[in-house]
Amino acid sequence: MQTKRVLAGVLTSTLLLGACPAALAADYNDSSLTGGSAAWQAWVDGWDVLAADFTQVSLTPGADETQLNFAWYSKDADGAATPVVHFGTDRNNLAPFEGTSAAVDSSLTNGEAYSYNHVTVTGLQANTTYYYTVEKSGTETEVQTYTTGDFESAQILYVGDPQIGASKGQPQNGEELVADSGAANTAARNDGFAWDRTLDIATAQNPGLDFVISAGDQVNKTGQAKEEEYAGYLAPDALASLPVATTIGNHDSLNPD
C-alpha cells in the first residue's frame, strides 16, 4: 500500500441545465442539436428498451485500490438472484467472487420484483488489465474490461450534477421535455444522452482515468421512484470500466431508489 498518493483532478460539467440562468439559449442542453444527428437518433431509437432496463451494472471504488465494488439489479422473473462477479486476467478463466442479494421494494420498479446484488472483488494489482462478467439470475453478461493504474497516483474525473431528468420543461423540436414515467420521460432521454456524450469526451481527452467523483444529484426526480433516470445515468459505455464514487445530493436524498 502506498502511503503517499498524488491526486490529479479533472473538472468537467455535464451541461444538463440544473440551475442554469434563464437567459441562456434555449438549446443550451438540447441533445438533439449538440450530439450529432446520427448519434442522437440512435439514442432515441434505443430509448424505449433502455428506459425499461433496471439491471445495468454500477462500479464503485473499493475500500482501497486493491478492491472494486459491483452493484446491479436482477429481475426475479428471470430466476433467483445470483450475486456473482467473474473476474481475472484471463478472459477464458475468470474467478468467481460471491456477494449478497436481497429484495428490492417493488414500489420502486413499477410493481415488478427485482433483487439487488452487491459484490466486492479483491486482490487487484497495479497496472493490470482485467476482464469480468456479472451474473444476472444465473446468466453471465458479456465480457467487459477493467484496467488498474499504478497505485502511486490517481487521476480523477470530478463531475457535478449529472441530474438525469433535469431538463424537463425545456424546448426540443417544438415540444417541451417532460418527466413522465418510463420511456415517456423525454427529459431523462435528453439528459442521458448528454451524460453519455460528456463521459465519452472526458475519457477521450483524459486517458488513464482511475475513477470519477460525482458531487451529487445523479438523477433529478425528488421523492418518487424514477428508475428510468437511473437507467439513463448508468447507460454510458464508459462506466463499464470507470468506477464512480457518488455523493448523495438533495435530489438523491429523498429518492428511495
Which ranges hold each PLM region?
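Generic signature of intrinsically disordered, low-complexity, basic-rich segments
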Residues: K4, G18-A19, E98
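A periodicity- and composition-biased signal for non-globular, repetitive helical segments
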Residues: V10-L11, G169
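Divalent metal-dependent phosphoesterase catalytic cores across multiple superfamilies
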Residues: Y28-T247, S253-D257
